A protein has these predicted regions:
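Pore-loop/selectivity-filter region of tetrameric P-loop cation channels
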Residues: 99, 104, 278-292
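Generic preference for hydrophobic/aromatic residues in regular secondary structure cores
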Residues: 235-237, 257, 264, 268
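Non-catalytic, topology-defining segments of multipass membrane proteins
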Residues: 1-252, 297-428
């Protein structure tokens, strides 16, 4: 029911939800599921309440419970029993295996099919992907494909327009709409390994992700002549629970932070952003603006200086025969996207600078004149980049291969435009 029809029916239009915003999704569910309104005709303001009937209790209990154990249990353990190099090493090895299984396996291999992998790679990523407790590869891929298809819209599972909290974790805690059918993963349903993991994903995660670290901690302490049960508890808490929490929230931050903070060098048609910090924390997944523009590329960080260990691992696997069919976007198309976005931003900035009113007063007059000079200088650079853009667009359509020297020159000119754009913000 829309706000207009609600008013006609004599109902009070609801205020925004208690934590996250649901500007469009809330239309699909009864208002009473989210709000408690006062008696009709009363002046009492609507009382926000948590939609307990829509809480995903199993998922919520796990996410909140593991976070509390990590935040409270781990410090208590370290304070009482200390922490040794074995536990730290096991934590980081497990974290790397888990994160790589999500980024390389769940994401780039299964969700986007950006390359093909042999069975050992599939088995490894499916086993340790289960240890992240982010659901099965089939479920994860289905959600992610819908995210790309409907990004920033109502059918996007972790739509950032509903708020940071919703995109980060709220979509997992609450199920406000019926689960959509998994009708976008027909290819994965034909993969026996994927379906086997889908059937036993929670058992795999429990045994390999939580019990095995405890067993290894027990064995290590027993071998070293220390209390084995202290080692078992440490393995469970540190390499098990704490590692799960860290891995999950690194993934969640891609859905929230990388749609909120960062640069958009390739497109502003969607909210995805590039973040070098998040790329470092997520094995290269932080270059999210590029990824949303070219989702089937096996790379996320395409620049030589960009941190993307997932890309390097896929490349290394291809060299030893464990991966093949690596998909990559041609450099010309990447540069064309950069040029298009730089030109769009430059034209908008030129209009802003030229709209600065000329004043007859001292400092204001000098500032306005400087802004107009900056607009003229920016115009000269954008004209050259526009010329390059049209030539590149024509060469792509006619399938003409440009020399590396020409491409390099155009890249430098585009970067110069971007740099001048940043400098122009020193003016009005």
């Amino acid at each position: 029911m829309t706000r207009g029809t609600a008013e006609k029916a004599g109902l009070h239009p609801p205020d925004p939800p208690f934590i996250y915003r649901l500007p469009t999704a809330s239309r699909r569910i009864p208002p009473a599921a989210l709000f408690h309104n006062g008696p009709k005709g009363s002046s009492t303001k609507p009382m926000h309440r948590i939609p307990f009937d829509r809480v995903n209790w199993i998922t919520s209990s796990f996410l909140i419970g593991t976070a509390l154990i990590a935040l409270i249990g781990v410090p208590i353990y370290v304070f009482n029993f200390g922490i040794d190099l074995f536990q730290v090493t096991m934590f980081f090895l497990y974290l790397c295996a888990t994160m790589m299984s999500i980024t390389l396996g769940y994401h780039r291999l299964f969700s986007h099919i950006s390359f093909k992998a042999k069975w050992p790679v599939k088995v490894f990523t499916l086993v340790f992907g289960a240890c992240a407790f982010e659901n099965s590869c089939l479920d994860w891929s289905s959600d992610h494909r819908r995210h790309h298809k409907h990004v920033d819209h109502d059918d996007d599972p972790y739509d950032i327009s509903k708020g940071f909290f919703w995109a980060h974790i709220g979509w997992l805690l609450f199920k406000l709409n019926p689960e959509p059918p998994m009708d976008n993963v027909a290819d994965l349903k034909k993969d026996k390994l994927v379906m086997l993991q889908h059937k036993y994903v929670h058992w795999i995660g429990l045994v390999v992700g939580l019990i095995l670290p405890a067993v290894l901690g027990y064995a290590w302490n027993h071998f070293m002549g220390m209390n084995p049960w202290h080692g078992a508890l440490g393995g469970f808490l540190i390499a098990g629970v704490a590692r799960v929490v860290v891995a999950q929230h690194c993934t969640f931050f891609i859905n929230s932070l990388c749609h909120t903070v960062g640069r958009q060098p390739y497109s502003t048609k969607h909210s995805a952003r590039d973040s070098a910090i998040m790329a470092f924390l997520t094995f290269g997944e932080g270059y999210h603006n590029y990824h949303h523009e070219f989702q089937h590329d096996y790379r996320n960080g395409v620049k030589p200086w960009q941190w993307d260990p997932t890309k390097w691992t896929i490349w290394a696997l291809s060299k030893v025969g464990l991966a093949e069919g690596l998909r990559r976007v041609p450099d010309a198309k990447i540069l064309l996207a950069e040029m298009h976005e730089a030109r769009r931003r430059a034209h908008a900035r030129i209009e802003e600078l030229r709209a600065t009113p000329i004043s007859e007063h001292g400092m204001a007059q000098r500032a306005a004149e400087a802004a107009h000079r900056a607009a003229d200088a920016l115009h000269e650079v954008v004209e050259q980049v526009s010329k390059n853009y049209h030539e590149l667009e024509k060469s792509i359509s006619e399938r003409v291969q440009l020399s590396r020297e020409v491409m390099r020159e155009w890249q430098l000119e585009t970067r110069a435009l971007v740099r001048q754009l940043r400098e122009s913000h020193a003016f009005a």
